[in-house]
From Swiss-Prot:
Cofactor details (free text): Binds 3 Mg(2+) ions per subunit.
A Pfam family annotated for this UniProt entry: tRNA_anti-codon
One GO BP annotation of this record: lysyl-tRNA aminoacylation
EC code(s) of this entry: 6.1.1.6
NCBIfam families: lysS_bact, PRK00484.1
Gene: lysS
Protein name per Swiss-Prot or TrEMBL: Lysine--tRNA ligase
Classification lineage: Bacteria, Bacillati, Cyanobacteriota, Cyanophyceae, Synechococcales
Amino acid sequence: MSEIREARLQKANSLVSKGFASYAESFSVSHTTKFLIQKFDYLENGQEEDFSVSLAGRVMAKRVMGKIAFFTISDQEGQIQLYLDKRMINCNLENQKLLSFEDIKEIVDIGDWIGVYGTIKKTNKGELSIKVEKWEMLSKSLQPLPDKWHGLTDIEKRYRQRYLDLIVNPHSKNVFKTRAKCISFIRQWLDNRNFLEIETPILQSEAGGAEARPFITHHNTLDIPLYLRIATELHLKRMVVGGFEKVYELGRIFRNEGISTKHNPEFTSVEIYQAFSNYVDMMNLTEELIKDIVFNVCGSLVINYQNKEIDFSKPWSRISMKDIVKKYTGIDFDSFSGDFQSAKQAVKSINVEFSNKVNSMGRLLNEVFEQKVESELIEPTFVIDYPVEISPLARPHLDNKEMVQRFELFIVGRELANAFSELIDPVDQRERMQLQQSLRDEGDHEAHCIDEDFLNALEIGMPPTGGLGIGIDRLIMLITNSPSIRDVIPFPLLKPEITSNKNEKLPLNEVK
């Protein structure tokens, strides 16, 4: 590696010695590869078009055959071939200060960024090309690309050095284009329905809105602990109290929890709140939004995910947690009539393991669902009516205070959305937060804190409201057929690589 780097560095220096920059300040690009390929697709083999272009890109392939050379360069939109003829490039050297054909042959390596000026032609073999008249070095690459056309096969290195992954794996680049398109579409969809995007604090004095362990930092001037937000819920609800009836925020959430193919400590979600609505309204909104996203991005409501066909056009199932647990396990929680010991024995008989934290019928029901049912829900399924113990911010059912008006959406065995009719009764909310605080005081780091300002806001008065949260990363996984959340986050959190000396980090390019 050091020999290759040294040779390339010498080439960069030779450019400077000739009076040219090896790292340009700018370059005027007239068109993209995508535009040129679409516009001139009609050309016949061997036909030329006197259409002037200037194009910049990274060199991905290089073939020199005497006085002719063929390069392939890549820009954000795709790839195109360069046709370089020694006579054409060298004909103006006496009148202008230009780089020669010999220069491009000797100095340019795969991985370099170059800019070219020329016209359009289609080769005799049918390859649309730019017939280069002159060229410039834009940025000299000092390190070679991995495996050229074969891609970056080391999965962990793909995540650590995403820039290399994007260069050599076209699929990865398409994933992040799709991600950007989805996020843009969601914002447009909500804006068109008169939702207002709100920016809530990332640094908060209280971490609330979800059962999750927060990241803690410290503000030096104020000398107080602060928390990275674990949800945007409580601040968005404050906006509803203030009179904004339809609000949302699409942004980053931080939870100090485990890492898996489904979890990253830093992730993206959209939370949506709509006054005068309940969880049924939010179910309808969720189904409409996700169907529109899938169709807009994929062009169809039927997609394939990891060899499973998902049909979004069919009516989405809506079933209570109790009923779906009974369906998949045979256990009817209503039959226990509150007898927790009998329920535990029945649950143990189907090999469900649980900790002492599972100390109520509702938590036990949820444990059975997560271990025995969740992974079976392949087609879009709304699981509704959750236990109150695990839903401290949701409105209870009038006819059954032990259950709340909440749903979660599951697709391919993963939770994709979570929503409920919001709890707007300040007295009930205080009682639930006090219970959560007592659990926290006993060592449950994921339990909610009491947020006095939020409770005060509820006492001012909050209208009936439906709230919804959608995990953007999991949605992108589904749409792009990606098996891991790390595939759809540009820079996922990874444990730093270190040498045997734990205090000495290796440069990434020298990590074996």
